[in-house]
């Protein structure tokens, strides 16, 4: 039987699955370890975009049109800052800004990120555990060729400012060799009956989590299911395909298996890729992985739990 579940998540793809999981499992036995490689400062404001997306998703506040920020938010402060000549890289809503101000206030007073996120999840009425991958600074950067010159870009410069329209040479997890995973993250994995790696970008959303000391070793001792973010030969959303190519992986479910082969026990792939299943050297669950409706999300969550519970 599967009672305790830990999910590894970025800010896209996996939150849709979380909407399904929160409706089919005991939320108090659900933990979500979230990528912080895209955390950044904009002026004096600390942003933890993937963490905030997970918080909003579990609190039923997420803007499902963008999968970033709060639904029906306003942007008066962002627009006024722009009028004053301060152009934020990310478009931050007014309600969303309050959460970021809360983080900033406590981080500047010496609190750990994981402590602040715990305060926020309680305030938002979330029963599941939401855990930043680390309390240390890890930053995902994109080595790219820009206007004929090699440059090291922050992720938001690459994806938001430049729309990913550069030649990617490599992806680097800056400082991950020295960062420690959150103790709560380690504890969550150890206590899990099942670890689900959601359909987030493997390179920039899950890769930073796996790069932390000891995480892969912990996962090798657990039952790990990976939900492929690739359907056919393209990513469901975001720059996963482009970044997988840059890291030398085929943009296919076979490429996803290769990326996770040291830890994966079950690979979940879409019906579109059923002919490839026999080429994957691990257990494979073939199902609909495209999550357009809440029913799709709940059905996928149930299918994963039932399939893994039978192994």
Curated annotation (Swiss-Prot):
Cofactor: Mg(2+)
GO molecular function, one term: magnesium ion binding
Recorded metabolic or biological pathway in which this protein acts: Cofactor biosynthesis; coenzyme F420 biosynthesis
Top-level EC class as recorded in UniProt: transferase
Activity regulation (record text): Inhibited by EDTA in vitro.
EC numbers for this chain: 2.7.8.28
Any one Gene Ontology BP term: F420-0 metabolic process
UniProt temperature dependence: Optimum temperature is about 37 degrees Celsius. Thermostable. Still fully active after heating at 80 degrees Celsius for 24 hours. Activity begins to decrease after heating at 98 degrees Celsius for 30 minutes. Inactive after heating at 110 degrees Celsius for 30 minutes.
UniProt-annotated binding residues for 7,8-didemethyl-8-hydroxy-5-deazariboflavin: 52, 91
Catalytic reaction(s) noted: (2S)-lactyl-2-diphospho-5'-guanosine + 7,8-didemethyl-8-hydroxy-5-deazariboflavin = oxidized coenzyme F420-0 + GMP + H(+)
Gene3D superfamilies: CofD-like domain, CofD-like domains
Pfam families reported in the protein's UniProt record: CofD
Keywords from the named record: Magnesium, Transferase
Subunit structure: Homodimer.
Protein family per UniProt: Belongs to the CofD family.
HAMAP family in UniProt: CofD (MF_01257)
Protein's job: Catalyzes the transfer of the 2-phospholactate moiety from (2S)-lactyl-2-diphospho-5'-guanosine to 7,8-didemethyl-8-hydroxy-5-deazariboflavin (FO) with the formation of oxidized coenzyme F420-0 and GMP.
NCBIfam families: F420_cofD (TIGR01819)
Protein name: 2-phospho-L-lactate transferase
Organism: Methanocaldococcus jannaschii (strain ATCC 43067 / DSM 2661 / JAL-1 / JCM 10045 / NBRC 100440)
